[in-house]
Amino acid sequence: MHSIEHIVARHFNYALEKTKDLPKSINNEITNEIIILKDYQYLVSRIFIGLSELNSLLLFWDTGYGKTLTSVYIMKHLKLVFPQWFFVIFIKKSLYVDPWLNTLSKLGMKGQNIKFVLYDSSSSLKQFNVLYRTIISSINTKNRILIIIDEVHQVISRTIEKSSSTQRNFLSIFNKIVKLANSENNKLLCMSATPITNNVLEFKYLINLLRPKIIEFKEDFIVNNTLKNHEQLKNGLISITSYQKISEADSFTNTSYTEGFASKNIFYHNVTMTPEQSNIFNIADKHDKKSALGGLKTMRRLVSSFAFYDIKIKGSMSQIEYNKMVSEKLNEFKSIIGNFKFSNEFIDIFRNNDSFSNAKSSEIEIFDKIKQYSCKYIEACKIILNSNGKVLLYEPLVSFEGISTLKIYFNIFNISYVEYSSKTESTRDYNIDIFNKYDNLYGNKIKVCIFSAAGSEGISFSSINDIIILDLPWKESDIKQIIGRSIRLNSHEELPIEKRYVNVHFIIASTIDGKSVDKEIFDLIKSKQDKINVLNSFMKVISIEQIHSKYKYAEPVENEYIFNNIRHTKIDDVNENNVITKIIVSPIYYCSEDNLNIIYNGYLDKKTGIIYSNNIPIAKLILDENNIYKFFIKDDKLVYITKSIYE
């Protein structure tokens, strides 16, 4: 009797046989260039197109792997299965022109029964409600619908309840998407490099979107960072994902250059505030502890970036009054600096950490003044001036304690820049085009692109050598998205091989007595990530790629049947009694079979071949044909090769 996994693989081969005549290339109708799909794009497209009953799929692909191109290829060729399709595409407003309209235009799909819904636009969502009623009233055998959700984690974050007693306004939209996607013969294609960003509850919503009512996933299904009743869950959720990663490493780990993808090097810059900035931080600390928003560390985060004489509290002021106060403070700061610019001689002294003894007293005075307000901005300027190429700088704060004052520092240091934020909506796409041009390959025309959260997803930069993260986001997934703006497939191909790297700089500010909101946020990020990593590993195991590679030569089925059975069979409640007992372990060096360049420290249970890190089972050793664990020697270390704990 075959396992469900084997039967699913036979269905994949049925789909591949059915779609064997689909072209692997697609024509760019603007440039007449022939675009060749990557093997993974072609494989997943054919399986999703060829299996009518595989109605939902998540493209869990790293940034830069071509999710948009693959989606449009699927749209173009679904007519192989059925001639009449209507497409509803959910996206962020900032992704409408690029990549979506541009990709659709290039591939000859613009305007062909396509409706965009901007999930961060209230007017667009109202239009979707009208569209939904029209679709529901007219669903018939003559039309089918493909729903595409780009950055699906954004939709889930807008849906998920903030507490057990509250529901989000977006929930009704979410439920309508689920109903449409699971109407007979319709399909759903979701996309994200980081489908789970904050907690396990997001996985519950993701399952309810892709395969609704099959299980009510709970956080306590993960015990000691191990997924309970893994096989039951695997059989019920099998093949809801396609999984492609540059590396299994997290955002804080160095990665080597691989074909098409730049290497990543992590640097931490610990900087100390001046006594003046430290004093304002302590005032902000007291304010945050009293404030209802203190848990968000709001005021401390602001003054860690820029502290000008006092903290800016809105209090009972109206928004107009508050904006006026902030504007006055900004003008006051500008008046202190005026149009001052450092000389090239002073910039060289600063860049090289040379003594200021030979610098002009007027320049030293200005330098001491601006350093007094922000140790972070000073460090960012030094990183930029020492960079050999173009620089991205992420700063989510747009107004006073953020981009507005940062740009003044850049002007003083004669650093050229463009801005991509909510305040530059009319010009930002043009700015990115200029920044990415070949004649700016090394930043000789425009050195820096400052971008806020508006540019943290969806947009692409080319030939970046340094990223500065000035203010940390709350989630590791957001950091991954930020880094992913610059490390994309072929993003560095115009640079020589030795320049195909990205240095990622985290600037961590502390007061003179060691207080640091940046360190607090780092600790919070890392504490959230363990359970998310368990689910990410699970999604790899149930992916199309894992199953197909295991049973690549399985005989195709004659007709589809398995996915309707799976979708309508509820997974039994997961056994609550799985517990982890104490075990004896030994220190070990290991690496993943997917990337032999990154070596980790762990602890091995010799009885089971399972490796642990921080009491978490994270990998298991691989046996060769002689039943001996695979290993190699590197730098006098015995390094064992491992695979996922769930394989």
Swiss-Prot record:
Q: Which UniProt keywords apply?
A: ATP-binding, DNA-binding, Hydrolase, Nucleotide-binding, Transcription, Virion
Gene Ontology CC annotation, any one? virion component
For the Helicase ATP-binding domain, which residue ranges apply?
Answer: 48-213
Q: Which residues form the Helicase C-terminal domain?
A: 377-540
Give the primary localization class.
Answer: virion
**Molecular function GO labels:** ATP binding; DNA binding; ribonucleoside triphosphate phosphatase activity
Give the residue interval(s) assigned to the motif DEXH box. 150-153
Show the segment(s) annotated as Binding to the cap-specific mRNA (nucleoside-2'-O-)-methyltransferase. 466-532
Superkingdom of this protein's organism: Viruses
Q: Where does ATP bind?
A: W61, D62, T63, G64, Y65, G66, K67, T68
Query: Which InterPro entries does the entry link to?
Result: Helicase_ATP-bd, Helicase_C-like, NPHI_C, P-loop_NTPase, SNF2_N
Q: Which family does it belong to?
A: Belongs to the helicase family. NPH I subfamily.
> Can you state the subunit structure given in the record?
Monomer. Interacts (via C-terminus) with RAP94 (via N-terminus). Interacts with the cap-specific mRNA (nucleoside-2'-O-)-methyltransferase.
Functional description taken from the UniProt entry: DNA-dependent ATPase required for providing the needed energy to achieve the termination of early transcripts. Acts in concert with the RAP94 subunit of the virion RNA polymerase and the capping enzyme/VTF to catalyze release of UUUUUNU-containing nascent RNA from the elongation complex. NPH-I must bind ssDNA in order to exhibit ATPase activity.
Give the protein's recorded name: Nucleoside triphosphatase I
Give the classification, highest ranks. Viruses, Varidnaviria, Bamfordvirae, Nucleocytoviricota, Pokkesviricetes
| Gene of this entry | NPH1
